Amino acid sequence: KRIHEYKRQLLNVLHVVTRYLAILENPRADWVPRTVIFAGKAASSYHSAKSIIRLIHDVGLVINHDARIGDKLKVVFIPNYGVSVAEVIMPGADLSEQISTAGTEASGTGNMKLALNGALTIGTDDGANIEIREAVGDDNIFIFGLKTPEVRALRLSGYQPMHYYESNPALKAVLNALSEGRFSPEEPGRYRSLVESLPYGGDHYLLLADYASYVATQLRVDSLYRQPVAWSEKAIANVAGM
């Protein structure tokens, strides 16, 4: 898929870093191992999207080489995404991340292909996620975040992303780690403008507003994955429903 701000791959990165920091804080906890796979292309002149791709690489480089993490968390970016790559990724995926801001996504088919191959979807109530939810049932999909009318209402009321930054310690720690160069020590300011565009720059796609719901829903994913029979039942329901 495309790497684009509205698709919010950056929100996925925020969760990855949240998970990384949490593992470091409590390494003896019974963590569900997670390999997070990114794949996609950005328009050649789309600076923010290119910066997100580079950030994914840098975050992966730090996490994948941190001996304290071991196999609890890995981050991979697969280049040159296309049909041939998708044919490998989609059958092997457990979880499909479809996390665009509600009201921005057209009804695509990538998420449907993943569901047809047995991946459970974590996503917003947007685009074809709505059709998948209707096809497989509310209990067989992980929906989080603001819905389209709520997005509209929040913007009209005067969205204040700094409120979310200041009121959520985990979110604040993640944004500070990225902004201060923890994942780009050779160039500490590399991602400062990208990250600071969220609390200070208006956060047009409402990443900070949906962050807490997204992280909480990822914990629900972990909880279900600890129950292989229940997970398999939901995966089968997705295949059958699609």
Residue ranges with predicted function:
Residues 34-36, 95, 121:
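Hydrophobic beta-strand segments of well-ordered beta-sheets in folded domains
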Residues 1-87, 101:
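Long, K/E/R/D-enriched contiguous segments that form extended
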Residues 37-40, 94, 148:
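C-terminal, helix-dominated tail/subdomain
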Residues 6, 240-241:
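A short structural micro-motif
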Residues 91-92, 99-240:
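Catalytic binding pocket for nucleotide-activated donors in carbohydrate/polymer assembly enzymes
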